[in-house]
């Protein structure tokens, strides 16, 4: 829930969505009428028509100027109550890049397809933003992973991810030969197309497609999922959130690339080493409802549940039998 004082929200929007202008301006109207300021990034202002050269003109409200254009930098979300992401999971991940260093939460409104990271669908925009205006929401922290690339024991690159770090063959040709290490001990060596290190949040993303388990977000853990491995033992692993995962690329093999959430990359030369640990900072999440994760998974993935009777019906049947 928000604190007292001036309230301001940073808007991040998917520029390729036809409905984004209408949705963004609807959000601006709701917030400004409630006295809440809105920030937009300078490089997004033209596509959302929040610059002085575009129509419709920015709306105004009790807060004065409806929209404040800010530069796209690590400080863009500093001082905001939250970051509002209008789009799909990719937009949410982009918003998280700005929200995390500012330690502010992200609220995702789905304008995409699945939108597993988002909290509400576009048709429920007014209701969702109404809850924000009233401060009727809670914030939960989701663990991240910090990733480091070492070459000859020297740190050469580092980054972080909310969903996963995906280590892949840079040339896309041949097999990537790796050695997996957990907590300082070797576990297995194998050839593969790649290997993922994921969080519970990322278990419903790329890791899900690669055959990894779905992990409830309340459970903190690190997941290791080999992709198309050529080995008898190369199964998905679930480790402690405090584990230190390392993947070494053999010196005679291929150069590799580490994709962080599919958005940022680190170079892994042959003979290099990737280390992943629990992130130093979480990504903070705006939650508007308390629906069970199972319900969310069924809804987002459109899972069939026909035939489910549930405990209530079972208990009533037992009660009828007891009376007989």
From Swiss-Prot:
Pfam families the record matches: NAD_kinase (PF01513), NAD_kinase_C (PF20143)
GO CC terms of this entry: cytoplasm
Cofactor requirement: a divalent metal cation
Protein EC: 2.7.1.23
Reactions catalysed: NAD(+) + ATP = ADP + NADP(+) + H(+)
Source organism superkingdom: Bacteria
Name this polypeptide is given: NAD kinase
